[in-house]
Curated annotation (Swiss-Prot):
Protein name: S-adenosylmethionine synthase
Record: residues binding K(+): E51
Location of the region described as Flexible loop in the Swiss-Prot/TrEMBL record: 108-118
Gene transcribed to yield this protein: metK
Alphabetically ordered keywords of this record: ATP-binding, Cytoplasm, Magnesium, Metal-binding, Nucleotide-binding, One-carbon metabolism, Potassium, Transferase
EC class of the enzyme, as a word: transferase
Family: Belongs to the AdoMet synthase family.
Cofactor binding description: Binds 2 divalent ions per subunit. Binds 1 potassium ion per subunit.
Function: Catalyzes the formation of S-adenosylmethionine (AdoMet) from methionine and ATP. The overall synthetic reaction is composed of two sequential steps, AdoMet formation and the subsequent tripolyphosphate hydrolysis which occurs prior to release of AdoMet from the enzyme.
Length: 398
């Protein structure tokens, strides 16, 4: 590894057009998990693959589902409008109350279902993966949440501004925003910030870039460690000069287009599959969560300072095809021992992952912005993959 280098990651807010779509797609997944038990449907049987497009005063939702008939289009529309309202869109070109919502959901393909569903108890067929693919998890001890510093702080900047906006403290700022942070590394450790970019929608049309900077700079400074911002740090706040038209009215959004923002900011490989809108039979989502969980627990256990972990699956096949670990020269034990240890410590079949991480719940809308990783586990089971409760078992296994 190079001793001195710069690395950059970006984040986007919940009002970014693609994130609006991620939120809507995950609200649909949560709706099916909430309503299923009320209708007597086993949560294990719920299926959802939901894609969303949002543009000027228009939302289109399409995909495949399996769940309670009680989930009607009217109910879905109500959930979607509530989500858009919560994000904060009440502008002429995209308003939660007046935008047109088109819903094009249909039953899951029987061909897919037969490869994924387990047979009845007592048979020998396990629940298979919902698709083929590769998934990566990553952890590093360079931040308290064991996330890479650039994406960690890019998220933190926007979350602080969002909290201020929702509280009413920053009423002139709109929902749509982006951040980007260039971190200086010395001896492989983050030590400062070279460049800061924040582009933030404003609701007063004639606001200047300097006026927007006056609003956002305190939150940037609050987000970053003391001493990281110096007189050499270069600021780019609304560098185009104006950001009044925002959200899906300014730029069409789609589900699943911010997969690097959702994960590690480019500091680790990505298998290519998006998360939002997918129930946990889709290993794009659940196995990526399991990969992060295992990598984080390896680092939390002190078995490595950095860890990249890959899982691979085939559709209809329960067991992972391969497990690969790279500790980037920081491991305290060999990678092959760690690969054996994680396989022993956790059932990595799709059903095993869903059970271990308790994923058959309405816990997904909250993941749709500010990253799926580096978050605090919730009491109701949200962000369960961020727990470090496997660390002791891994230490014993090696």
């Amino acid at each position: 590894m190079r001793a001195s280098y710069l690395f950059t990651s970006e984040s986007v807010s919940e009002g970014h057009p693609d994130k609006v779509c991620d939120r809507i797609s995950d609200e649909v997944v949560d709706l099916f998990f909430r309503e299923g038990p009320k209708a007597g449907i086993d949560p294990w049987a719920i299926r959802a693959a939901c894609e969303t497009l949002a543009t000027t005063n228009k939302v289109v939702i399409a995909g495949e589902t399996r769940g309670p008939a009680s989930v009607t289009n009217d109910q879905i529309e109500s959930v979607v409008r509530a989500a858009i309202k919560d994000i904060g869109y009440e502008q002429e070109g995209f308003h939660w109350d007046t935008c047109d919502i088109e819903i094009l959901l249909h039953p899951q393909s029987a061909d897919i279902a037969q490869g994924v569903d387990a047979l009845q108890p007592g048979t020998n067929k396990e629940e298979g993966a919902g698709d083929q693919g590769i998934m990566f998890g990553y952890a590093t001890n360079e931040t308290p949440d064991l996330m890479p510093a650039p994406i960690f702080y890019a998220h933190k900047i926007l979350r602080l501004i969002s909290e201020a906006r929702h509280s009413g403290k920053e009423k002139v700022l709109g929902p749509d925003s982006k951040s980007q942070v260039t971190i200086q590394y010395e001896n492989g450790k983050p030590v400062g910030v070279r460049e800061i970019v924040v582009s933030h929608q404003h609701l007063v049309e004639d606001m200047t870039s300097n006026q927007v900077r006056e609003r956002v700079e305190p939150y940037v400074r609050q987000a970053l460690p003391d001493g990281w911002i110096t007189d050499k740090t270069i600021w780019h706040i609304n560098p185009t000069g104006k950001f009044y038209i925002g959200g899906p009215d300014g730029d069409t959004g789609l589900t699943g287009r911010k997969i690097i923002v959702d994960t590690y900011g480019g500091a680790a490989p990505h298998g290519g599959g998006a998360f939002s809108g997918k129930d946990p039979t889709k290993v794009d989502r659940s196995a990526a969560y399991a990969s992060r969980y295992l990598a984080k627990n390896i680092v939390a256990a002190g078995l490595a300072d950095r860890c990249t972990l890959q899982l691979a699956y085939a559709i209809g096949v329960a067991r992972p095809l391969s497990i690969y670990i790279d500790t980037h020269g920081t491991g305290k034990v060999s990678e092959d021992k760690l690969e054996k240890a994680v396989a022993e410590a956790m059932d990595l079949t799709p059903r095993g992952i869903r059970s271990h991480l308790d994923l058959n719940k309405p816990i997904y809308a909250r993941t749709s912005s500010y990253g799926h990783f580096g978050r605090t586990p919730d009491a109701d089971g949200g962000f369960s993959w961020e727990k470090t409760d496997l660390a002791d078992a891994l230490k014993r296994a090696v």
